């Protein structure tokens, strides 16, 4: 039985980290694509040469030709311009929309049966555009956002409570931006909801509110520290978790930017919601009940995403 083929579109910081993680986990053979000749080939060769030391069996190929992604089982899209200090994810809209058109056409022509995970920002608008440009089924095109945002939330909570991250669960819904909605009521430590932990004196509401805000600002915090780019280790790890759920039919319940058609009262748009990922792609959107305040925050986030979608339509009139 042939190993799965995983195409990574974009050989920047996230793309290179993805290639390394996929090889280490032996999820499949890697094709690293980029338009900058030499970069994907050099990174693929460097990672491949670590194989004898790290003891993984995986083929890695760098390329500038979309034909090399032919038949890929999974495509992870990181191509585009990263954030720099002072930029919001939304500032990237015009530049990265053109990139999504090119990538969508390349995937449609060469890997139409792939499960496509988009990481390019502004995420919710880019995955929506990518699905239209590629024409792939909506359940096979998804955005990586909630897994990363929830991981950041979990990290901050584990630090605050001085407990293992393995015992912390957290949910972040909504758009991948300043309006994201970390749900404290659905987040737990070993099954104990965060509001109960506040009542038990483990933390204060003020500290919890600060953690929620730090989660919203998580990407910007790293951009500000790095000064020359944006996060790449945690985004890559988050996308690999999604790819693994698909390839191994794990039926993981993960928050992702998924297509909504009636769920949460939304129609014909992508936004961060709880999903089940298995061999069918996004097999289910889990329509959880939101409280009044949670719904108001979620609606605000949805409206921000809709604004980006309208801006995209103004740039490219082929989008509907």
UniProtKB/Swiss-Prot annotation:
KW Oxidoreductase (keyword) present: yes
GO BP annotations, alphabetical order: lactate metabolic process; tricarboxylic acid cycle
Main enzyme class: oxidoreductase
Pfam family, one: Ldh_1_C
Keywords: NAD, Oxidoreductase, Tricarboxylic acid cycle
InterPro entries, sorted: L-lactate/malate_DH (IPR001557), Lactate/malate_DH_C (IPR022383), Lactate/malate_DH_N (IPR001236), Lactate_DH/Glyco_Ohase_4_C (IPR015955), Malate_DH_type3 (IPR011275), NAD(P)-bd_dom_sf (IPR036291)
Active site per UniProt: 176
SUPFAM superfamilies: LDH C-terminal domain-like, NAD(P)-binding Rossmann-fold domains
Database matches in Gene3D superfamilies: Lactate dehydrogenase/glycoside hydrolase, family 4, C-terminal, NAD(P)-binding Rossmann-like Domain
Binding positions (NAD(+)): 10-15, 34, 96, 119-121
Reaction equation(s) it catalyzes: (S)-malate + NAD(+) = oxaloacetate + NADH + H(+)
Molecular functions (GO terms): L-lactate dehydrogenase activity; L-malate dehydrogenase (NAD+) activity
Top-level taxon in the UniProt lineage: Bacteria
CDD domains xref list: LDH-like_MDH (cd01339)
Family, similarity comment: Belongs to the LDH/MDH superfamily. MDH type 3 family.
UniProt protein name: Malate dehydrogenase
Organism, scientific name: Dinoroseobacter shibae (strain DSM 16493 / NCIMB 14021 / DFL 12)
Taxonomy of the source species: Bacteria, Pseudomonadati, Pseudomonadota, Alphaproteobacteria, Rhodobacterales
